[in-house]
């Protein structure tokens, strides 16, 4: 492993560590994560300027990119959850008021019954991030499935089906060496 690969591997490990921290602990220091990510961006920028990247370096860069997207979405989700909880308690206090109008809340409940059939971008990023992290053995354990259920707000069967479909997609995209040789010569 050359010095670039070692540095990129370390950056990838640090980002993965932040993802695990955010997944496992409800309380974390966002400033610490931000400072670390900014320092890693500076390191990556200097590595990119060297223009002597190997295939392994490029693969590590792709993994870092995937981790950074997942980390970004997780931070956004945490911020939104915090804002949602503040909004919930504010609305709850307002609804406890004797001056609240119950007809408005009935109309809002009817609008919420319409559900989308596709997964949101955030859900896909969380699931894809998990898959990329566990690409060598993409079979979720019970605790991992529960974490994915909580972070994506999907049902157990939706999470399991997505993982199964993603494994199949990964398997179907791989071309055997014999077939690759035939395709290249033909």
From Swiss-Prot:
Entry's induction text: Induced by HBR1 in response to hemoglobin and growth signals.
Record key words, sorted: DNA-binding, Homeobox, Nucleus, Repressor, Transcription, Transcription regulation
Function, as annotated: Mating type proteins are sequence specific DNA-binding proteins that act as master switches in yeast differentiation by controlling gene expression in a cell type-specific fashion. Transcriptional corepressor that acts in conjunction with A1 to repress transcription both of homozygote-specific genes and of genes necessary for the white-opaque switch, a prerequisite for mating.
Annotated region of DNA binding: 112-174
Predominant cellular place of this UniProt entry's protein: nucleus
Subunit structure comment from the entry: Forms a heterodimer with A1.
One GO cellular component term noted in the UniProt record for this chain: nucleus
UniProt xrefs under Pfam families: Homeobox_KN (PF05920)
SUPFAM superfamilies: Homeodomain-like (SSF46689)
Biological processes per GO annotation: cell differentiation; negative regulation of conjugation with cellular fusion; negative regulation of phenotypic switching; negative regulation of transcription by RNA polymerase II; phenotypic switching
Protein name per the record: Mating-type-like protein ALPHA2
Species assigned in the record: Candida albicans (strain SC5314 / ATCC MYA-2876)
Localization in the cell: Nucleus
């Amino acid at each position: 492993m050359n010095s670039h690969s070692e540095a990129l591997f370390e950056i990838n490990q640090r980002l993965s560590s932040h993802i695990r921290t955010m997944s496992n602990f409800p309380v974390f220091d966002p400033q610490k994560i931000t400072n670390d990510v900014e320092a890693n961006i500076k390191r990556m920028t200097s590595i990119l300027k060297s223009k002597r990247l190997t295939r392994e370096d490029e693969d590590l860069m792709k993994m870092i990119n995937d981790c950074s997207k997942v980390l970004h979405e997780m931070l956004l989700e945490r911020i939104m959850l915090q804002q949602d909880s503040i909004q919930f308690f504010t609305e709850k206090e307002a609804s406890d008021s004797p001056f609240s109008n119950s007809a408005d809340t009935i109309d809002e409940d009817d609008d919420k019954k319409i559900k989308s059939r596709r997964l949101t971008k955030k859900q896909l990023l969380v699931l894809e991030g998990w898959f990329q992290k566990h690409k060598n053995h993409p079979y979720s354990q019970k605790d991992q499935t529960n974490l994915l259920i909580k972070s994506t707000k999907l049902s157990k069967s939706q999470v399991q089906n997505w993982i199964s479909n993603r494994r199949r997609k990964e398997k179907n995209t791989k071309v055997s060496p014999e077939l690759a040789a035939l395709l290249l010569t033909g």
